[in-house]
Amino acid sequence: MRVKITLACTETGDRTYITKKNKRNNPERLELKKYNPRLRKHTLHREVK
């Protein structure tokens, strides 16, 4: 089952990105390096509830 998740920046806390993931294949929290427009650089974004 695919569910919508929100990705929050670890440096500023901004929630800029929304994506989907399969909870059966990836039960742990998703971490991706994404672009943060406020800082103008790539930062680590983590899945939040």
Swiss-Prot record:
Keywords per UniProt: Ribonucleoprotein, Ribosomal protein
Keyword Repeat: no
Entry's Gene Ontology molecular function annotations: structural constituent of ribosome
Keyword Ribosomal protein: yes
InterPro entries referenced in this protein's UniProt entry, alphabetically: Ribosomal_bL33 (IPR001705), Ribosomal_bL33_sf (IPR038584), Ribosomal_zn-bd (IPR011332)
Domain of life: Bacteria
Pfam families (alphabetical): Ribosomal_L33
A Gene Ontology biological process term: translation
One GO cellular component, as annotated: ribonucleoprotein complex
Family: Belongs to the bacterial ribosomal protein bL33 family.
Name of this protein: Large ribosomal subunit protein bL33B
